[in-house]
Amino acid sequence: MALSEPILPSFSTFASPCRERGLQERWPRAEPESGGTDDDLNSVLDFILSMGLDGLGAEAAPEPPPPPPPPAFYYPEPGAPPPYSAPAGGLVSELLRPELDAPLGPALHGRFLLAPPGRLVKAEPPEADGGGGYGCAPGLTRGPRGLKREGAPGPAASCMRGPGGRPPPPPDTPPLSPDGPARLPAPGPRASFPPPFGGPGFGAPGPGLHYAPPAPPAFGLFDDAAAAAAALGLAPPAARGLLTPPASPLELLEAKPKRGRRSWPRKRTATHTCSYAGCGKTYTKSSHLKAHLRTHTGEKPYHCNWDGCGWKFARSDELTRHYRKHTGHRPFQCHLCDRAFSRSDHLALHMKRHM
């Protein structure tokens, strides 16, 4: 039963120095070991309690709701960046998440990174040139035809705000390029995009948007303009060029009139008339008239010089035709058969048989 009693003496025994010296001689090794162990245990307990309190504080803090995912064409406001709030937790939680303090690269400026629900992301302010990032430049909107945005009311106004001040739900269309910053055209005073095909992401225009009348077509019918000018007593507008494509160069060359050449043969008047009594024939050439007069006079100046032939003719073509009889030359040949003729009129009669 002596071993079941408490090992440490009571506080009343420390009043007597003799008793204290006896106790030290009785337990020479217990006191230094117990003192060193208590210090180590106290330091470990303090560290565990501090970590436990930090963990309990981090767990007790309510988690903020996750931010809504940004739309595909959302551009962060240059004048009012979202406030940065320190993450909940103590020193250990801050050291375990060093990526929050890492600086963002130039390609990530102006973007919102999607993080788990328990994290809060710090958004850096965009660059001055407005490039890099999926968003619409100030003054540019994506909506129906004619939707334009004039000067922004303030730096805190967003280009994709709805009537209630909240951003519309993200459209179904993906971003322009997921693997690189998108380059948008420089913002101007009035700019509009072509009309989309429609979808749930395109709602009613915001307060800074209005419908502009469609631009008149560059080319069209001019009957209405001429009628309106005539009704107002003004001169009709000058005729504009045709919308048809230009003709080919060959057609243009053929359409031009050729100088020095007549498109149709000019009928020559018969000025040469036979003066013989009772004959009123006329000819266009004087040679023809001379040959005709030989029929009246009986003159035959063209003689055949073939041996034994004394034929005479009033015309040279008649002598040539006669001379072919002696030589057997037949220059007129039928292209449908093998027959040939010495006279062209004989060939014409032969061709009628093939028809």
UniProtKB/Swiss-Prot annotation:
Q: Where is this region: Interaction with WWP1?
A: 111-268
The cross-references to Pfam families, in alphabetical order and at most eight, read:
zf-C2H2
- Which example biological process does GO assign this protein? negative regulation of sprouting angiogenesis
Q: Which residues carry this modification: Phosphothreonine?
A: 173, 244
The species this protein belongs to is Homo sapiens (Human)
* Region Disordered, annotated ranges: 1-42, 55-90, 120-209
- Tell me the protein's name: Krueppel-like factor 2
The listed location of motif 9aaTAD is 43-51
* Keywords, sorted A to Z: Activator, DNA-binding, Metal-binding, Nucleus, Phosphoprotein, Repeat, Transcription, Transcription regulation, Ubl conjugation, Zinc, Zinc-finger
Chain's role: Transcription factor that binds to the CACCC box in the promoter of target genes such as HBB/beta globin or NOV and activates their transcription. Might be involved in transcriptional regulation by modulating the binding of the RARA nuclear receptor to RARE DNA elements.
Which GO cellular component term is one of those annotated?
A: chromatin
Q: Where in the cell is it found?
A: Nucleus
Q: Which Gene3D superfamilies match?
A: Classic Zinc Finger
Task: List residue spans of C2H2-type Zn fingers.
Answer: 272-296, 302-326, 332-354
What's the main place this protein lives? nucleus
List, in alphabetical order, the Gene Ontology terms for molecular function in this entry. Answer: DNA binding; DNA-binding transcription factor activity; DNA-binding transcription factor activity, RNA polymerase II-specific; RNA polymerase II cis-regulatory region sequence-specific DNA binding; sequence-specific double-stranded DNA binding; zinc ion binding
> Mind telling me how this protein is modified after translation?
Ubiquitinated. Polyubiquitination involves WWP1 and leads to proteasomal degradation of this protein.
Biased composition, Pro residues: where in the chain? Answer: 62-85, 165-198
Assembly and interaction partners: Interacts with WWP1.
**Domain of life of the native organism:** Eukaryota
Coiled coil segments of this chain = none
